[in-house]
């Protein structure tokens, strides 16, 4: 059996083939945290627009924990706001309000509000993953993955929902554990 985790799933339910983990309060959640999963047990961890809620000092131990839970060769699939494309959107429009959401996003989480603390471009995200021992790092297309039918921020575009001609807001990268 393939063990797939939707980490930071929020209100998105990918169905019974996935384990849903989030710190929020949603009916479909299976767990609140990944910490109690056995080491080297998970085939795929998908985290869409989660990393940006942690600052650069916090993210290394978090990614190390996630990596420790992946089987050898297991996949960490990430989606984060793409700084290069946000900059391109700003250059095209001259309107900062068009990028404030993905750049400084906020979300209610229980009795508090959490905010984006950092941003990545392709080079910085790849360098971070390589420094932690991830290999075979590549971009992924939401149209070709098993969860592509579930619309989440990995499919965000400017103009909104212009998936044919728009600029992708999300940087989608996946990496293998130690290949």
Where are these regions (language model features)?
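Active-site flanking residues adjacent to catalytic metal/cofactor-binding acidic residues
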Residues: 5, 21, 48, 81
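Adenosine-cofactor binding site in Rossmann-like domains, unifying the SAM/SAH pocket
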Residues: 11-39, 47, 141-142, 147-163
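A short beta-strand submotif of the Rossmann-like class I SAM-dependent methyltransferase core
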Residues: 44-50, 59
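Structural motif
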Residues: 3, 43-44
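S-adenosyl-L-methionine-dependent methyltransferase catalytic module, highlighting the catalytic core
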Residues: 56-65, 69-71, 75-178
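Residues at the starts of beta-strands that form the adenosine-phosphate
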Residues: 3, 17, 136
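Conserved class I S-adenosyl-L-methionine
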Residues: 3-10
């Amino acid at each position: 059996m393939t063990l797939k985790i939707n980490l930071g799933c929020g209100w998105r339910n990918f169905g019974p083939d996935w384990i849903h983990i989030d710190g929020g309060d949603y009916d479909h959640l299976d767990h609140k945290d990944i910490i109690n999963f056995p080491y080297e047990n998970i085939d795929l961890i998908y985290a869409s627009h989660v990393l940006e809620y942690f600052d650069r000092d916090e993210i290394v131990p978090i990614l190390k924990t996630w990596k420790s839970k992946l089987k050898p060769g297991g996949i960490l699939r990430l989606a984060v706001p793409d700084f290069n494309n946000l900059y391109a959107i700003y250059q095209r429009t001259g309107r900062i309000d068009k990028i404030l959401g993905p750049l400084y996003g906020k979300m209610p989480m229980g009795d508090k509000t959490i905010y984006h603390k950092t941003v990545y471009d392709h080079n910085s995200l790849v360098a971070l993953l390589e420094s932690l021992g991830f290999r075979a790092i590549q971009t992924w297309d939401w149209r070709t993955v098993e969860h592509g039918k579930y619309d989440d921020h990995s499919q965000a575009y400017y103009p909104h929902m212009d998936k044919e001609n728009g600029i992708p807001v999300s940087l989608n990268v996946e990496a293998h554990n130690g290949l």
